[in-house]
Amino acid sequence: RNRAGAPLNPIANLRLAEGEAMVHQMRALIAANLSLYEADDSQTSTTDRMVSYNTLKVSASALVIRVTEIALRICGIQGYMEDGEFYLSRHIRDAHSAMVMVNDDRILGSLSSVVLGMPITRDV
């Protein structure tokens, strides 16, 4: 805080709140899929489960990239300094690898044909 009591970097504070919201979103996605996995629910089809799990993977890989980008914007150039305490290059690289290692486009391509053939009877 400065002498007037205002935050030193209000934009960084906004980015921090944005990143925190995305982390909560990711946790909610994981919790929902964990509940689906643990549920002994005969009403949920195998196809619905597959769509949900694959959507989790695609969503999580996009969210982790966005969260690391926000962290870099907060840290600034210090995020690239290898000897600094805010070094983020490895985290950024690892975040991008999630989208590439098991290709999200391939997953979405498979999902599109499955989802297009599903009846719209489930909750939105």
Residue spans for each PLM region:
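C-terminal helix-coil-helix/basic helical segment that borders enzyme active sites and/or dimer interfaces
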Residues: 25-59, 72-82
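Amphipathic alpha-helical coiled-coil segments
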Residues: 63-71, 98-105
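Generic structural signal for well-ordered, non-transmembrane alpha-helical segments
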Residues: 17-24, 54, 58-65, 93
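Extended amphipathic alpha-helical segments enriched in small hydrophobics
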Residues: 1-40
